[in-house]
Amino acid sequence: FFYLGEERARKLISRILAMDEEEVRLLLGQILREFSTRHRSITTILMRHYQKVAHLVQELNHTESVSEYRKLLIGCYFTMEYAIESAALFNPSVVEDPDQTNLEEGQKQVIISLRATGEGHISSLVFRRAIIDRNNEIIMQEPGFLVDEAEVVRDHLYLKKRFVSKLMEMEVPADIYSLVLDKLPEEFTYDQIRECTLSLINGNNQLPINKRVAVEEILWLADSYTRIRFSLDTDLSERVIFPISRYEKNGIEDARFVKFTNDNGESVYYATYTAYDGYTI
């Protein structure tokens, strides 16, 4: 998703809304012909990016409905093709693959997580599969050709009591988090706490820097409760995890996965990772 601020976005959308429908279809067709062979379900990606600026389109276009073609073209202008491994591919970490089928005796299949550094030196997480043979030789499997970005799902329902407990562990002052949480019900959504937090940050220029940092820690905690999901028809080597929250915007890296087996026999993989927002690691 390529976004350089609301003012520029409004000007760009206004120009696209001013185009006639034939021009829109012609330009969209040229874009799809050039890029559809390099990306899976590119129209889905374009529509997803359109939805992120749809509120601006509604503000600028009160009377006329926007066609599907025009929505996709708007999505094009908020999409940036990015070479995720153009600068480096390094810092591997290995964990046992849950799928150990179709192997020869003495072989073990593993999943390797890596730090991929692309244009602008923004880091993301990528994966490869490999086989370790009986002689401890590592045989890398060929990665997929297409790359799939995770869909971010923010459907977590926060419990105020538990959220406050976490903030206390983080030593966020009670007089600070009460400015946000006192406005919320006992159960609240991500959108609710984000709106309350940002309104306090953006609407109070007199807020001292130490209190502003404490308020941003509230949003950081809310951002940490995020799920991502990939399409089932993607190979593991085609999946990339980009920075998601504003506190990861300069890169996420060095994931270290560990397999845990629960008492009921089910396995789950946990990982620590490093994130950077340009100021704080």
Name each model feature, range by range.
Residues 1-281:
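Beta-propeller domains
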